[in-house]
Amino acid sequence: MATATIALQVNGQQGGGSEPAAAAAAAAAAVVAAGDKWKPPQGTESIKMENGQSTGTKLGLPPLTPEQQEALQKAKKYAMEQSIKSVLVKQTIAHQQQQLTNLQMAAVTMGFGDPLSPLQSMAAQRQRALAIMCRVYVGSIYYELGEDTIRQAFAPFGPIKSIDMSWDSVTMKHKGFAFVEYEVPEAAQLALEQMNSVMLGGRNIKVGRPSNIGQAQPIIDQLAEEARAFNRIYVASVHQDLSDDDIKSVFEAFGKIKSCTLARDPTTGKHKGYGFIEYEKAQSSQDAVSSMNLFDLGGQYLRVGKAVTPPMPLLTPATPGGLPPAAAVAAAAATAKITAQEAVAGAAVLGTLATPGLVSPALTLAQPLGALPQAVMAAQAPGVITGVTPARPPIPVTIPSVGVVNPILASPPTLGLLEPKKEKEEEELFPESERPEMLSEQEHMSISGSSARHMVMQKLLRKQESTVMVLRNMVDPKDIDDDLEGEVTEECGKFGAVNRVIIYQEKQGEEEDAEIIVKIFVEFSMASETHKAIQALNGRWFGGRKVVAEVYDQERFDNSDLSA
């Protein structure tokens, strides 16, 4: 039918149409005719598509292998995560731009008759002053230092929103200065007080306020005056494993506390490493600042200072970090969905692989889902954060996902066979007096007064047992020879397997004639061997010297920090 129609059209146009048009019509008719003559080979099936048409042949695809299916699921998960991140970033940027636009419009309208109400005008001025107070100028930066180094040095004072380094387009290097913007003004104030003239990359950096602070100085002074009415202090560089109650128990040694709150991330629910404490008396806040600033709590040096702004809930974003509430809710829902999918996928895989009576599925599933967070002991020196080394394999714990019912996780029968053996092993490893506390007992421990800091430190240090022993006051620098390392290795080998021995000479000053002390570090394969060696060697006399044997922090040792 199509061939006949086109042929009629061609014949109808032969008289009055042009030759190119006739040739094109004839070519089209030939193509259609060829299509009508072609038939699919026998034995093939047609596939009917959504638009009603059918394909001539069925393209058979091989089934996916289990590895390909797993890779496909991972790709889908990654795509979903990236989509969530993209949406959150866009919403956050739009939210911040809207706030900036509102402030700019407020400033413009205030310059032309001020149609805003007095309360709105004051709020806009205070927001602008707070934004300026969150920024610090950093000058005299060595040209080889990058943004990562600046961030690492200034991060202990509080979360950094942005670092703006000015770059030279000709030399492709920065111009030696930068602006660091924090989330809260107190972080910028602490950085200003403690980082000015600090040696960084061989130079003494200069830290000060931006040059445009002058126009906001009256509002800043007013905020500082209002802050004096509240006995609040700012605490930063808080260990991630510490809770509000832990910090409160440590700081209430200086006086009665009215409130203690750590700022939290709305997406993860974890605190952001800083918070505010309000005392009933001004003297208590002063004592806390003078005593707790640069206090080593769990391997991180606390940064403590007076609050420079009053509590202003009306002027702060609805959610911490400036994230819109809708974005926070969306992120939480998406995260829960991904977690649920992981739980279902993990349960399905284990259901096909597990052998009844041999391995408990709950113990197997604990590795990807329920690994406990490792303790972070991450400071070589005040203001410097080092890398994190996992302490030991995570303890298997089954954590059920919200909204997901998994029959495999519910009371496996083989778990009861393994528990008596586990209890017997614990009895052999730990005497009754030295048995470690259960995690639930540690979470509800009650500590206060002067011993609070010691108790919190013990709670943190229990999570990572060190295998390193340090021997002090054992030899003089002049007594060091080639045989000393072998002698120490042989002597300490009586208590366990020695991985390595390091003899470290530490100079106690910059002067040429400064005293040099010798530390000998011995790393064992197990923490129990370390404790056994310390008990045997501590207090022993060696060459007329009384040896001091102590446990050395594992994280410092792993990061080659032998200065403690």
Curated annotation (Swiss-Prot):
Name positions with the PTM N6-acetyllysine: 256, 459
| Residue stretches spanning the membrane | none
Q: Where in the cell is it found?
A: Nucleus
The chain residues annotated with the modification Phosphoserine are: 117, 249
**GO CC entries:** cell junction; nucleoplasm; ribonucleoprotein complex
Alphabetized PROSITE patterns for the sequence:
RRM (PS50102)
Presence of keyword 4Fe-4S: no
Concerning Pfam families, the annotation shows: RRM_1
What InterPro entries has UniProt attached to this entry?
Nucleotide-bd_a/b_plait_sf (IPR012677), PUF60-like (IPR006532), PUF60_regulator (IPR051974), PUF60_RRM1 (IPR034209), PUF60_RRM2 (IPR034211), PUF60_RRM3 (IPR034212), RBD_domain_sf (IPR035979), RRM_dom (IPR000504)
Q: Report keywords, A-Z.
A: Acetylation, Apoptosis, DNA-binding, Isopeptide bond, mRNA processing, mRNA splicing, Nucleus, Phosphoprotein, Repeat, Repressor, Ribonucleoprotein, RNA-binding, Transcription, Transcription regulation, Ubl conjugation
What processes does the entry annotate via GO biological process terms? Answer: apoptotic process; mRNA processing; regulation of alternative mRNA splicing, via spliceosome; RNA splicing
Query: Which parts of the sequence belong to the RRM domain?
Result: 134-212, 231-309, 467-554
- Give me the ranges of the annotated region Inhibits homodimerization: 1-521
Keyword Magnesium present in the record's keywords: the answer is: no
In chain numbering, cross-link Glycyl lysine isopeptide (Lys-Gly) (interchain with G-Cter in SUMO2) is at 48, 85, 424, 463
Which region ranges are annotated with the description Disordered?
37-61, 421-442
* Family assignment from sequence similarity: Belongs to the RRM half pint family.
Quaternary structure, per UniProt, is: Homodimer. Associates with the spliceosome. Found in a complex with RO60 and Y5 RNA. Found in a complex with FUBP1 and far upstream element (FUSE) DNA segment. Interacts directly with ERCC3. Interacts with CDK7 and GTF2H1. Interacts with SRSF11/P54. Interacts with ARGLU1; interaction may be involved in ARGLU1-mediated modulation of alternative splicing.
Know anything about its domains from the record? The third RNA recognition motif, called PUMP domain, is atypical and may rather mediate homodimerization and/or protein-protein interactions.
**Protein name (database record):** Poly(U)-binding-splicing factor PUF60
Lineage summary: Eukaryota, Metazoa, Chordata, Craniata, Vertebrata
